[in-house]
From Swiss-Prot:
Residues 72-222 form the HD domain. This is Deoxyguanosinetriphosphate triphosphohydrolase-like protein. Transmembrane segments: none annotated. It holds the Pfam family HD. It comes from Mycobacterium tuberculosis (strain CDC 1551 / Oshkosh). One of its GO terms (biological process) is dGTP catabolic process. One of its GO terms (molecular function) is dGTPase activity. SUPFAM superfamilies: HD-domain/PDEase-like (SSF109604).
Length: 431
C-alpha cells in the first residue's frame, strides 16, 4: 500500500527485513490483525529485556541514589511521552515516535555516558563504542526475538521506519575522508543492516521522527536534570538572575556548545529567570508549596520547548501529516539557547562536582577491569549466547566486540557483583 493523506506511511516503511510467519497460538476465529505494524514494534521494544535493564543504569546520578532517582529507564519513558505529544502536533505516527523515545538509550552501558567513554577506550583499536550504534545493534541482532533463514538473530526485526526513527546519527564512524567521527549510528559490523534501513533515504539526514526523538531527549534531560539538581540542593535557580553567576555559566556554555554564543546564553538566562514559574521556585525547601512550584516549572518548560518546535516546524512545512522526510524539525535559536542554559546548570553544579568526578573515575576503572577479565578468560567467562558468538568470531576485533556487547548489556548491579567477585571484596567497598 502506498502512502496517502489518510496514511502517510507506505509498505516500504512497514517492511521487516525477515518475513515472519503468522502467530499460531490464538484461539479459532481470533486471527485478525488489530494493531498497526508500528504498534507491534512499540510492544516489542516495551517487552524487551534490554529496556528493562535500563532501570539499573545511570542517567546522571546512580539509580540507587536518593528516594526517587531518575534512571535510564525513567528518562526513556519521559522522552517517549514528550515525543508522543510532539507527534500529535506534527502528524507523525504516535507509536513510531514513542517507540523511538523508548529505544533511544537502549544500548547505553552501565554508568551512562561515563560507561560509554570507558567502553570506547576498551574497544579503541577495534571500532570503538558508541551508545547510538549500540542501540541499532541491539534492535537488529542482540535482543532475541526473530531469526533468519540461516538461524542468525535478526533482533526484534522492527520495520524499516521504526529502526530509522531510532537512528539519530545515520552514518558510520569513518567519514569517508580518513577521519573518525565521535558520534555515529552504525558499527562497520552492522553495515548490511544499516544499508537496508537507509535504502532510499537522503544521505546522512535523519528522518523527522528521529529528529523529534532527539529534541524530546534534549528537552527531557535538560529540564529533569535541573529538577533533580534543585531537589538535591545542588542547583539554585536564582543564579540565573545573578548577572555575575549567569555570565560565568554563559562562558562555560560557549566552550561546551560551540554553536551558541555567550551573549545568546546570557539573554536566554535572563528570559528564563523572568518567567514567573522560575521565580516561584526561589530557594527550594521541599515543602508542599515548593514541590508544587517545582513540578509546575518542569511541566511548563517541557511545554514551552516542545510547543515551540511544533509551531515553528508547522510554520515552515505547512499543514498535513509531517512524516519521514517530508519535513525537518525546526527549533528556534532562542529556545535552543534556553535548553543549553539548563544543560550548563547541570554540568556546572552536578557533573563537575569533585565527588561525582571521583566516582566516575572508579566506574571507568571497574569497566576496564571487568573487560580484561572477560576477554582473557573467554569464552568461559561469557554468557552462553555471547560465548557462542565469541567462538565463531572471525578475528580479534570481532571477539573484542562480543566482550563489549556483553558488558554493555550489564546492569550496574551485575557489573559491580562481577567486579567484587573478581577482587574478592564486598560490593560496598567498590562504591
Amino acid at each position: 500500500m502506498s502512502a496517502s493523506e489518510h496514511d502517510p506511511y507506505d509498505d516500504f516503511d512497514r517492511q521487516r527485513r525477515v518475513a515472519e510467519a503468522p502467530k499460531t497460538a490464538g484461539l479459532p476465529g481470533t486471527e485478525g490483525q488489530y494493531r498497526s505494524d508500528f504498534a507491534r514494534d512499540r510492544a516489542r521494544v516495551l517487552h524487551s529485556a534490554a529496556l528493562r535493564r535500563l532501570a539499573d543504569k545511570t542517567q546522571v546520578v546512580g539509580p540507587r541514589e536518593g528516594d526517587t532517582p531518575r534512571t535510564r529507564l525513567t528518562h526513556s519513558l519521559e522522552v517517549a511521552q514528550i515525543g508522543r505529544g510532539m507527534a500529535i502536533g506534527l502528524g507523525c505516527d504516535l507509536d513510531l515516535v514513542e517507540l523511538a523515545g523508548l529505544a533511544h538509550d537502549i544500548g547505553h552501558p552501565p554508568y551512562g555516558h561515563n560507561g560509554e567513554r570507558a567502553l570506547d577506550e576498551v574497544a579503541a583499536s577495534h571500532g570503538g563504542f558508541e551508545g547510538n550504534a549500540q542501540n541499532f545493534r541491539i534492535l537488529t541482532s542482540l535482543e532475541p526475538k526473530v531469526v533468519d533463514a540461516q538461524g542468525l538473530s535478526a533482533g526484534l526485526n522492527l520495520t524499516r521506519a521504526s529502526l530509522d526513527a531510532v537512528t539519530k546519527y545515520p552514518w558510520m564512524r569513518a567519514d569517508g575522508l580518513g577521519s573518525q567521527r565521535r558520534k555515529f549510528g552504525f558499527y562497520d559490523d552492522d553495515r548490511e543492516s544499516a544499508v537496508w534501513v537507509r535504502q532510499g533515504a537522503p544521505p546522512e539526514r535523519a528522518c523527522l521522527e528521529a529528529q523529534v526523538m532527539d529534541w524530546a531527549d534534549d528537552v527531557a534531560y535538560s529540564v529533569h536534570d535541573v529538577e533533580d539538581g534543585v531537589v538535591s540542593e545542588r542547583i539554585d535557580l536564582r543564579v540565573l538572575a545573578a548577572e555575575e553567576d549567569a555570565a560565568a555559566l554563559a562562558r562555560l556554555g560557549e566552550r561546551e556548545f560551540s554553536r551558541v554564543s555567550a551573549d545568546e546564553l546570557m539573554a536566554a538566562a535572563r528570559r528564563l529567570s523572568r518567567l514567573p514559574v522560575v521565580a516561584a521556585v526561589g530557594k527550594y525547601d521541599a515543602t508542599l508549596s515548593a514541590s508544587v512550584a517545582l513540578k509546575r516549572l518542569t511541566s511548563e518548560l517541557v511545554g514551552r520547548f516542545a510547543s515551540a518546535a511544533i509551531a515553528t516546524t508547522r510554520a515552515a512545512a505547512g499543514p498535513g501529516p509531517l512524516v519521514r522526510f517530508r519535513a525537518d524539525l525546526q527549533v528556534p535559536d532562542l529556545v535552543r539557547a534556553e535548553v543549553a542554559v539548563l544543560k550548563i546548570l547541570a554540568l556546572q553544579f552536578i557533573m563537575s562536582d569533585p565527588r561525582h568526578l571521583e566516582t566516575q573515575a572508579r566506574q571507568r576503572e571497574r569497566i576496564h577491569r571487568v573487560a580484561h577479565r572477560l576477554y582473557s578468560g573467554a569464552p568461559q567467562t561469557l554468557d552462553p549466547v555471547y560465548a557462542a558468538a565469541f567462538n565463531t568470531a572471525a578475528d580479534d576485533a570481532a571477539r573484542l566486540r562480543v566482550v563489549v556487547d556483553q558488558i554493555a548489556s550489564y546492569t550496574e548491579g551485575r557489573l559491580e557483583r562481577i567486579d567484587a567477585d573478581q577482587l574478592g571484596v564486598s560490593r560496598n567497598a567498590l562504591d
